[in-house]
């Protein structure tokens, strides 16, 4: 029995003045239903020579399961009175936060599963607790961190918007493309979104010149915002959006019987050579050639004008190698978070859950 007490004392991380008392199994219909560990405090313990024991109180905390059995920690703890001022105080316990009915280790596992599955109901069902208690644990650990959090800056930044609810409500994510860390989340998707990010960095004394590369779609608002507020940063338009733009212009041509579809296929496939050019000079020369051939073969003046408008942002990929692929993957998870919660009434709660899900809180 001494060996068992010694083992569980070590597993529970108990140190003086706390020690392990009874270990009890709770039976239901002759079968073990749960385990309870009673923690006691040394009888002669006092915070100081000015303290006397005033009273006792009992409390139980749910702990991590022992094998397949739910386990609980129970303690009868003293309330001390300070003889100098007559005030009472309780002893601080190392295994749980104040006011919680769960141990710190239990709450840690709840948060780990919630971060993984992004659904409070699923997490609650797994641990056999009420969803509101999962919400309470989540709020306790994330609210203050979210309020204290400030925007970060990085060398390579990806920018992408995502919807917060049905309609036209959006938030914009700023992500470090080198490690996937969320740098900031701003409301909206206008040029002011980029401006607000830059201004917050300046207020915090963080140099906006740290940003060398921006990866973004061809949103005029984002392009304008980066040009005005991050003038030293190089812009690269996401490959996927560039290819999608070209495909959108070519799609109507496939409906025509007067145009050779094999020639269309070849010309579209030929565009992929752009991404393998050695440098921006070669890429610019190739894009000019491809654009001129497009105009000559298919009379696509509007596409050529669009390429001219976004020319450098397209060819910059050859050297920057940055894309928004990481953000597109994150966006899929973000939309799952929104669906799992059946929407968020308040945008700040949605932003907090995103930061939590991606490890930024």
Question: How does the language model describe each region?
Answer:
Residues 1-93:
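Short, conserved DNA-binding cores of transcription-related domains
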Residues 41, 82, 127, 161-163, ...:
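Short, flexible loop/turn elements at secondary-structure junctions
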Residues 60-168, 208-209:
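Short, positively charged, Gly/Tyr-enriched micro-motifs
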Residues 91-94, 177-183:
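Gly-rich Lys/Arg/Thr-decorated short loops/hinges at beta-loop-alpha junctions or inter-strand turns
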Residues 99-102, 183-207:
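Active-site beta-loop-alpha junctions of metal-dependent nucleic acid enzymes
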Residues 130, 141-145, 218, 253, ...:
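The DNA-recognition helices of helix-turn-helix-type DNA-binding domains
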Residues 138, 166-168, 176-180, 187, ...:
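Acidic/histidine-rich catalytic cores and adjacent linkers
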Residues 248-257:
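Short, surface-exposed amphipathic charged segments that create phosphate/polyanion-binding patches used
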